[in-house]
C-alpha cells in the first residue's frame, strides 16, 4: 500500500502543474472570446469560427510531438541522458516541417469558411483574417511544445505551468493593443486576437528556451554542437510513435465538431443546452487529461529503469487516482448541475436541457477518465498504434452512429434529440475505456524482456 501512496504523491506532483497550465491555456481562449465580443458580436463569431478550424490543425501537430515525452522519460530513466539532446533537436526539425503544413492549411482555410451555409461575407472575411494572422504563431506554438515535452519527459512540469500563465498575462495587454488600436498600432478588431495570440506563442517559446538554456538540472543535456541536420531514422521513429496520437486527437476533436453540426438544425434551445453541457464537461476533462500526461512520464521513466513491476504500479496508481477524481467531479456535476447551467444562461428551457445533459455527462466522466489515463499508460509503453485504432473504433464506429440513431431516428426509441448524442458519447467512451484496459492488461502480461525491448526503441 505504501508504494501506491508514494506513487500517487509523485503523480499528483507532476499532474497539478499540468492542470494549472491547461487552466491558463483555457483562460487565454476565454479572454480572446470576451475581448473580441467587447469589440463586436461579428468579431466574436469570427474568432469562434477561426478557432474551430485552428484547433484540429494545430492539435494534429501537438499530438505528433507528444511522442517526445515517453522517449525522453525512458532515456532519463535508463541513464542515457546524453542521447536526449539529439532527440529534442529532431523534435524541433519535425515541428518546423509540421508548422509549414499547418500554415498552408490555415492560409487556404478561406475556402472552407466561405463554403459554410448562409455565412455573412463580412463575417467570413474577418474569420479568414483572424486565421491568417494566427497561423504565424503555429511555429512558435509547436516549438514551445517541443521544449515543454523535453521538460515534462524529464519530470519537470512546473516550467510549462509558469510559461502558460506568462502567456496569459502577455495576452491581455497585447489583445487590447491590437483589437482596439493603441500605441500606434492599427485597430484590427477580432483579427487583432489572432495577431496577439501568435505573438504570445512566440513569447512562450522564447521564455521556455531561455529556461532550458539556463536550468542547472539540464546542463548535461544541452546542445553544444550546433543544431545539426535532420536525422531520418530518429524522425521516422518519432512520426511512427506520434502519428497515431495525432490522428486520435484529430478524430476526437472532429467528433465533437460533427455532433455540434448535427445538433445545430434542432433549434436554438437544443444547441445552447448541448453547448453548455459540452463546455462544462470539457473543463472537467482537464483533470484526467493532465493526470494522463503524468502517468506517461512515470511509466516511461520506470520502464527506462528496467522495472516493469514499477511501471505497473504507476499505471494502476494513475487509474486509481483518476477514478477517484472522476467520482468527485461526477458528484459535483450531479449536485450542482442547475446552478452551473444558470451561470451560462438564464433561459428556463435551456437550463432544464443543460441540466439533463449534465446528468449524462456525469455518467461518462468515469469512462472518460479511464480511457484518457489508459491512453497515457499506453503512450508510456510506446504502444501508440493501439490508441489510434481504439479511438477510431470507439468514437466513429460505435459512439457516433449509435448517437445518431438515438438522437435523430426512431429505429430503437423515439427521437431523443441532443440526449441521444450524449448516450452515444457514453457508449463510445465506455467502449474506449474497456478496450484501453484490455490492451493494457495484454501488454503487462508479456515477458519483461519484450516490454523493455519495445520501450527502448
Swiss-Prot record:
Pfam assignment, any one: MatE
Transmembrane segments: 11-31, 53-73, 93-113, 127-147, 160-180, 188-208, 243-263, 276-296, 314-334, 350-370, 387-407, 418-438
Keywords attached to this entry: Antiport, Cell inner membrane, Cell membrane, Ion transport, Membrane, Sodium, Sodium transport, Transmembrane, Transmembrane helix, Transport
Domain of life: Bacteria
Entry's localization field: Cell inner membrane
Any single GO BP term: sodium ion transport
Single GO molecular function: xenobiotic transmembrane transporter activity
Any one GO cellular component localisation term in the record: plasma membrane
Membrane topology reported for the UniProt record: Multi-pass membrane protein
Ranges per topology, Extracellular: 32-52, 114-126, 181-187, 264-275, 335-349, 408-417
InterPro entries found in the cross-reference section: MATE_fam, MATE_MdtK, MdtK-like, Multidrug-R_MdtK
Cytoplasmic compartment segments: 1-10, 74-92, 148-159, 209-242, 297-313, 371-386, 439-457
Family matches, as PANTHER family: FMN_FAD EXPORTER YEEO-RELATED, MULTIDRUG RESISTANCE PROTEIN NORM-RELATED
Family: Belongs to the multi antimicrobial extrusion (MATE) (TC 2.A.66.1) family. MdtK subfamily.
HAMAP family the UniProt entry points to: MdtK (MF_00400)
Function text: Multidrug efflux pump that functions probably as a Na(+)/drug antiporter.
Protein name from the UniProt record: Multidrug resistance protein MdtK
Species of the source: Salmonella choleraesuis (strain SC-B67)
Amino acid at each position: 500500500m505504501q508504494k501506491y501512496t508514494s506513487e500517487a504523491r509523485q503523480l499528483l506532483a507532476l499532474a497539478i502543474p499540468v492542470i494549472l497550465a491547461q487552466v491558463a491555456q483555457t483562460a487565454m481562449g476565454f479572454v480572446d472570446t470576451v475581448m473580441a465580443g467587447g469589440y463586436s458580436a461579428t468579431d466574436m463569431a469570427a474568432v469562434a469560427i477561426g478557432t474551430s478550424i485552428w484547433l484540429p490543425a494545430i492539435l494534429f501537430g501537438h499530438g505528433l510531438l507528444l511522442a517526445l515525452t515517453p522517449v525522453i522519460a525512458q532515456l532519463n530513466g535508463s541513464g542515457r541522458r546524453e542521447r536526449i539532446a539529439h532527440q529534442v533537436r529532431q523534435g524541433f526539425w519535425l515541428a518546423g516541417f509540421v508548422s509549414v503544413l499547418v500554415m498552408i492549411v490555415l492560409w487556404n482555410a478561406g475556402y472552407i469558411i466561405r463554403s459554410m451555409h448562409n455565412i455573412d461575407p463580412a463575417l467570413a472575411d474577418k474569420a479568414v483574417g483572424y486565421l491568417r494572422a494566427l497561423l504565424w504563431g503555429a511555429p512558435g506554438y509547436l516549438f514551445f511544445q517541443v521544449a515543454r515535452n523535453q521538460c515534462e519527459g524529464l519530470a519537470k512540469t512546473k516550467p510549462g505551468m509558469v510559461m502558460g500563465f506568462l502567456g496569459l498575462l502577455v495576452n491581455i495587454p497585447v489583445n487590447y493593443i491590437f483589437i482596439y488600436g493603441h500605441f500606434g498600432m492599427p485597430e484590427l478588431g477580432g483579427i487583432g486576437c489572432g495577431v496577439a495570440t501568435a505573438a504570445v506563442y512566440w513569447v512562450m517559446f522564447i521564455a521556455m528556451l531561455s529556461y532550458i538554456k539556463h536550468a542547472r538540472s539540464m546542463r548535461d543535456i544541452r546542445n553544444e554542437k550546433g543544431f545539426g541536420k535532420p536525422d531520418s531514422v530518429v524522425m521516422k521513429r518519432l512520426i511512427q510513435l506520434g502519428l497515431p496520437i495525432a490522428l486520435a486527437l484529430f478524430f476526437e476533436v472532429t467528433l465533437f465538431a460533427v455532433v455540434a453540426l448535427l445538433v445545430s438544425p434542432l433549434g436554438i434551445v437544443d444547441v445552447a443546452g448541448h453547448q453548455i453541457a459540452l463546455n462544462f464537461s470539457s473543463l472537467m476533462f482537464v483533470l484526467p487529461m493532465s493526470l494522463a500526461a503524468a502517468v506517461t512520464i512515470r511509466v516511461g521513466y520506470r520502464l527506462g529503469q528496467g522495472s516493469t513491476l514499477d511501471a505497473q504500479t504507476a499505471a494502476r496508481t494513475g487509474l486509481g487516482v483518476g477514478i477517484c477524481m472522476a467520482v468527485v467531479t461526477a458528484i459535483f456535476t450531479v449536485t450542482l448541475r442547475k446552478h452551473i447551467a444558470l451561470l451560462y444562461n438564464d433561459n428556463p428551457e435551456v437550463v432544464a436541457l443543460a441540466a439533463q445533459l449534465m446528468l449524462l455527462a456525469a455518467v461518462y466522466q468515469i469512462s472518460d477518465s479511464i480511457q484518457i489515463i489508459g491512453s497515457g499508460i499506453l503512450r508510456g509503453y510506446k504502444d501508440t498504434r493501439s490508441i489510434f485504432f481504439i479511438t477510431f473504433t470507439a468514437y466513429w464506429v460505435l459512439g457516433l452512429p449509435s448517437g445518431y440513431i438515438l438522437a435523430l431516428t426512431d429505429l430503437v426509441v423515439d427521437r431523443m434529440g441532443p440526449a441521444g448524442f450524449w448516450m452515444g458519447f457514453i457508449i463510445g467512451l465506455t467502449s474506449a475505456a474497456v478496450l484501453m484496459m484490455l490492451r493494457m492488461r495484454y501488454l503487462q502480461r508479456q515477458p519483461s524482456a519484450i516490454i523493455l525491448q519495445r520501450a527502448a526503441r
